[in-house]
């Protein structure tokens, strides 16, 4: 077995763990090991046979055992188990779209851009350039890069100074491109009082602001609702991300008056997203329908933290179709020119 094949197996295992909701450090360990094996100048199979595989940086006892099993059997038991658990869901996406044509409902082919992705500037795994290239391969016309703001509690701390630098970087990138646009953005954490991380002058310079709750989930429904409505009323907030904060099977939605939030969003012209992270799928169908009925443009997003999770758009589409959304209900079925008119700036 070649180094590339071993690396691919560990890379796949990392992705499977990620989609199963594993701790990000565990996922990162497999991806780091995969890179080390891919870059190793010696045959990893020969090193393993000689009992020297742990000489490779990042390879400890657990990974050594998985590599030895892979070399002996051609697969890794934990990967087999996860494939049996997850692709049932992955295959379900394709079969659902095929078996439920739902005349007039939104389809993946209608999507023109993704408005929620992350890069190495915060807690993503790929660079801005890599994410842009992957989005272009999917036929998108635009991609927003709203890396996490300073107080979200994980990943790198994107200070105001670093965000100004990212704005300049994206503006320069767009100058040399035609037919595809990157949006300089931020996924800004909403404080318990509805305040946002960055000063107003910085928020005003961004192309796209998505505001989300990442902290203090246990406050009362009244306070949580006021918190989110205050963010919605900010003239620089274009969209609210993963509205109820749920992580399926791991964390219940926090207490929030969704109807009140929808009413405020409709009043202020703020979009709401269907977050396609398979562990979120938030808005759920009922809430997506409520938003569409209120005239709110719903955004189908991936919350991608790497190029492979740009595929999360399928999960968002499943929810949208289950809610009966048409292309007209979905903001990012529009061309860049038409979509840009929905942005508050």
PLM features per residue range, with description:
Residues 115-121, 142-146:
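Ser/Thr-glycine-rich phosphate-binding loops at phosphate-binding pockets of nucleotides
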Residues 125:
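Positively charged, glycine-rich low-complexity segments
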Residues 1-106:
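Long, highly charged, low-complexity intrinsically disordered interaction regions
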Residues 144-145, 186-188:
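Core AdoMet radical
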Residues 2, 33, 42, 54, ...:
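Charged catalytic cores and adjacent phosphate/nucleic-acid-binding surfaces used
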Residues 120-122, 305-306:
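Short strand->helix junction
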Residues 3-6, 138-145:
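Short, compositionally biased low-complexity segments
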